[in-house]
Amino acid sequence: MYFNKMIPELSVTNLENSLKFYQTIGFKIEYERPENKFAFLSLGEIQFMLQEISKDDKWKISPLLYPFGNGINFQLEVENVDKIYSFLKDHNCKIAFEIEENWYRQDEKLLGNKEFLVQDPDGYLLRFSEDLGCK
């Protein structure tokens, strides 16, 4: 298995709930360590690690308050953003920003994305994005 050079590990309050959410939107469990309440997930080239919070968590440097990941969002490039968006809306997931087209300047060209933001069960923001090319 190939591991990306950067793989976010998200602290979650309930691994089972988080796995249901991520699997529902297409993530695959690559491997698990049930004894540690840990799972490694992938969706295409996107990789995440999930670890259920424990009271003796050595990685926790301050109390975790909902929503987790405050101040950050993860951009996940997918091939069909409309399909994921519709599915999440149909399942009453908390959409933070509705789907829209955005064009971002890179030097002299504009790069397009069709994107939206959704919160996972612990409040992490996931920005699903589809490449619209450049102009």
Segments predicted by a language model, with ranges:
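Vicinal oxygen chelate
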Residues: M1-I7, K28-E79, Y85-Q119, S129-K135
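Catalytic core of Fe(II)/2-oxoglutarate
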Residues: S11
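Acidic active-site catalytic centers that drive phospho-/nucleotidyl reactions
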Residues: N14, N80, D120-D122
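Amphipathic alpha-helical segments
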Residues: N14-K28
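Conserved active-site tyrosine of GNAT-family acetyltransferases
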Residues: S18-Y22, L88, G123
